[in-house]
Amino acid sequence: MHQLFRLVLGQRDLSRAGDLFSLDDSEIEDCLSQALEEIKVISCSPDYLTNDNDQAVVEICITRITTAIRETGSIERHGAALVSLWESCLEHNLQPQGKDEDTPHAKIASDITSCILQNYNRPPVMALAVPVAVRFLQQGNQELSRNMSSYLSLAAIAKAELLAQHTEAITCSVLAGNTMLLRVLPSVYPRQPEPIHQHVRELTAMMPRLDQTGRQHLLRLLQMISDLHPLVLSSLVPLLIGFLGDSDLGDSALGVLVNVAQSSPVSLAPFLSTLRNVGQKNPWLLGHIAKIHRAVGLTSEIQARGALQYLVSLLASMEHSAHHTLLLEIRCLTDRYTSILGGGGKDIYRMSNSFSAIARLLGRKLEADGAVSRGEEKVQDLPRPHEAESGSEMFAENLHLQVKIQAFEEKIGDEEVESEVDGASPGPQRRHSLGQAARDERREMRFNRSKSLALHAVRTRSINSDSSPEGEGLDLNAELNVCEAETSSVSSTPHNHTELTETQPDTSPNTEGAKVEDGDPRERDRLWIHLRDNMEEIKSFCAEMIKQIPVPEHCVIEDSHRGCVAKLSFSCPLKGHYCLYGKSSFSLCSSQPHLWIQIMLLALQSKESEALCCRDECVLQLRKLWEKTQLTGAHSFELAMTQTTVPHKKDVDSLQMYLEEVRFFDLFSYSEDKGGWLCFMCSNPEKATVVNQDGQPLIEGKLKEKQVRWKFIKRWKTRYFTLAGNQLLFRRGKSKDELDNNTIELSKVQSVKVVAKKRRDRGLPRAFEIFTDSKTYVLKAQDEKHAEEWLQCINVAVAQAKERENREATTYL
């Protein structure tokens, strides 16, 4: 051992301990292991906990030794001695004695931890360190556990097999609250799955308590389990179903359920109706939900019929690009249970480009099966007289429906012949051309026109046959409304639908098919069906939404360097004597035109007792706005408006946040009595008289004005400001008695904007800018509360000044 080390450690000489740092690393490299053994003897002595001198000597020596090991790269040479000292700390108390006060041995362990575990990419060192590191996780010292977890996570990436044998201890540490180690479990799971299987329920139950990072690691683990051992998760299906309501978890949780459904479809069968509701609210999840229905449908013919009816119904709600996936699931079911379609299964593959033909074929087959099952029920249980009457009415309705379908088949027969001829190319691949694109577009239009009639047949049979144990999981109320609408009278308002008229082939007016087609053209209107089926949800949403976000009175789509923006105008409906927007309006530009258009459509629908259709004038206007914003390849207006029933909460919140940024809520507030958004003056008539008194200040006090143009130079000068009438007065001094006045004409103010303290800071602002045609003023209040008061008063005064100017101009004219 080096002489200085022998002196310091042998005599516990604290005065000479600092001299160790004057030695070159190469001088002491050979004796580091010996020094560590001597330190171990000192730290294990009975009086070490009470001897401050020994503790100080040990801390200095450990710091010097670990520094030398790092600088010389000799961790593998001295690793055994270092780990031995590290392990000896486990024999002593490591729990903190007070707040932020570690025990002497906890300090030693902490100093050694980083030196050892920073070498996580060196297998010989990790082979010695990992067994000891895992034991530290159970000592109750959170700081040590956190540091250990961080390094073990890195070790799991570099050499997961070293941690695999300690999977049980790591899992128990996670369950005890050390969630940082969740990232280790996916690395060790393939090598040691059993310990995790034993605790998988407790791990899954932790999900709601985890942060975003922890959730991602746990979901990754569950995904691995579902890939390798899906049956382990079959008992956790109710827990996983509960995660589907969380937007952050839904997609991943559903992916896990898809894998579970492949191995244990019976465990998913009781939750099909829940999955359908989730799919209705989150259309992007329908692909996974369709796979689960296919897996459950393969368990029995009864389940297959129910799954088929649901999958066919999805053809109406999913966009065109998803139809191929749905057809694969349908094909899988019909291949397993050929009796459902009889000999017509091959037609599905032959007509794979004609979705309308597929929907019609499935509807007809399922209808026929439903009729057979109903016939058997009638033989077993003869109806009473009034039931017989009801049955005859049902038979008449079915006969009428068959006539409809037959007429529909005749109507599109020529089109399908054309489609089949187009599809008869000799090669395995078809060349895409402008002609093919046109045919695809016509095919899509035919599908949109046909799906309502075909699906009506499927859904009606789904309700009446009751062949599935879950009632097929469809919204019965909505489906009954579909049936009622089929027999209800059509609005007498004349409409012309150019798109549909152009794509319909000529038919004799005397044929039965023509009479059926002319019955209710709205049945071919995708938007009308969507709004009709979701009217209650839309009204409920709008009743709450209108209290958070106003509906624009006017909207114009304009091009800007950032793309299309919506220029929105809002005015006050009350038009009181002191109204801020009696002759003018509050305008803003939003970069979310699509969202505003959807909100305007929903607001219009919420005021109507009947569903709007594509031919209504207000809808046509919104469609024109949509088309101005539409990019190449984007969804059509009807498709986009029917993707989701109402906007997501985060979208509504983003609009509300934007309105706050442009200070909309300074000038408007929602009135429960009037049921609308009124301007500040009309909402507060008692304040209007005070505000409009000539010469009476609306607000006054001290503000700081920035003296230089550049924002990063913080040089502020205190001024005294007075807001009165049409002017914002300020004096060069701090007192209101100063004579040197400067004036900002409020009618010349272009805008008032907030200066945030930081881009990420979403708190209330302290500073704000006033823009005129010739100058910009940067002002700062003493705190956030005063800043809010000044901002609201200035915005109200500016709006009032501009409204007064507009009235004077109108009077003059």
UniProtKB/Swiss-Prot annotation:
Keywords assigned: Cell membrane, Membrane
Residue spans of biased composition, Polar residues class: 486-511
Gene3D superfamilies attached to this UniProt entry: Pleckstrin-homology domain (PH domain)/Phosphotyrosine-binding domain (PTB) (2.30.29.30)
Highest taxon listed in the record's lineage: Eukaryota
BP-aspect Gene Ontology terms: brain development; ear morphogenesis; regulation of signal transduction
Region (Disordered): 414-445, 484-522
InterPro entries, alphabetized: ARM-type_fold, Melted-like, PH-like_dom_sf, PH_domain
GO molecular function: phosphatidylinositol-5-phosphate binding
CC terms in the record's Gene Ontology section: plasma membrane
Compartment(s) where it occurs, according to its Swiss-Prot or TrEMBL record: Cell membrane
Occurrences of domain PH (ranges): 696-799
Membrane topology: Peripheral membrane protein
Bilayer-spanning residue ranges: none
Tissues with expression: Expressed at high levels in kidney, and at low levels in eye, brain, gill and heart.
Free-text note regarding domains: The PH domain is required for membrane targeting.
Family: Belongs to the MELT/VEPH family.
PANTHER family tied to this protein: VENTRICULAR ZONE-EXPRESSED PH DOMAIN-CONTAINING PROTEIN HOMOLOG 1, VEPH-A/MELTED
Protein name listed in UniProt: Ventricular zone-expressed PH domain-containing protein
